[in-house]
Amino acid sequence: MKHRRYLIWMLIFLLLHAPAAHAGQTAVTGPVTGSVQGEGPLTVTDFFGRTLTLERPANRFACLYAFTGHVVTLLGRGKDMVAVVDGLKKDRLIQQRVPGIQSLPIPAKGGVIHIETLLKADPDVVFLKPETAAAEAETRKLERFGLPWFVAGYRNMDEQMTTIEMMGKICGRYDAARAYTGYYRDMIHLVKQRTRKIPEDQRVRLYHSVNEARRTDAAGTIEADWTRAAGVVNVSVGNRLSARGDKFFAGMEQILIWNPEVIIVNEAGVDQQILQDKKWAAVTAVQEKKVFPIPVGISRWGHPGSLETPLAILWTARKVYPALFSDIDLEMEIKQFYHQFFDLVLTDEMVQNILNNEGMRQAMDAR
């Protein structure tokens, strides 16, 4: 099956001028459905290299990292979440897919686990982000009460896919996880094939704004990895940045020296902030009005905790190298992606809202 997908991807690449092609047509079959797979014991390895053994696939999930709630939903088990973090309740498509999410308890905030709330939720497994799992005081709470926990972390796309597949085993939905990672790998292959002949000195120089105008990507992160896969030169990667915890910031003088040709931003309104700020006026991307908001669906595409990174790769490559991707119907690709992996049927209006980063995340005080 994998070989067959590869051959069809190659055919798509050769038929660049075929009308209305879409990048994932061979991977997209239908929405994730089906029952929990496997009844016996299972063993997985998490991001910290810990081995977790369960007697059977879990049925009650505490998702103390928003990414893991997205994965559980992707695997068709969103209704089995019993505890979440606040950020998951902001995502409108998650609200649509998991209608009861607003009533779920929030047993962790700011990396601190409120064990009484978590115990009342009675999870079979607790999914943690690495920062929380690194705090011994927090994991001791879980160990004291015998709660199994899994660290969902990654620094690049391969590690992210491995984490998703391990979670697929925990959820009893390994086949669904493999369907998603197969699509992910196929998209990387497609885009790399189409951009591989562009000389390094002719690749578009891109700056990626993360939440704030001057927050950006460092080397050794998944953002550095996926922007490389999109065929661009990410100007901040490998250069000196100011670190604040796990966040990285560029100085304005450095951005002017980099002089990116394209800027992509993942926070609504930051594109206009950059375009209107006189300090950015000398940047080529600003002068040529090539400052674009990144689409937002289940989450911000290409954000560290995003499951839409395959779409972010395609969208970015198509935005900066339109002639190489003119045959791909991006709107259809988006509809098929969300239908297969989240069982969502998107209207044309919803697709445009995703592409324009409009109204897809709910303000916390609006609930």
Language model: regions and residue ranges:
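A short, structured surface patch at a secondary-structure boundary
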Residues: 63-121, 125-133, 232-235, 243
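Bacterial N-terminal signal peptides that target proteins for export
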Residues: 1-8
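A contiguous binding-surface segment within folded domains or other stable secondary-structure elements
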Residues: 239-293
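Boundary at the C-terminal end of the N-terminal hydrophobic targeting segment
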Residues: 21-23
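Extracytoplasmic substrate-binding proteins
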Residues: 32-36, 41, 51, 136-215, ...
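Bacterial N-terminal signal peptides
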Residues: 9-18
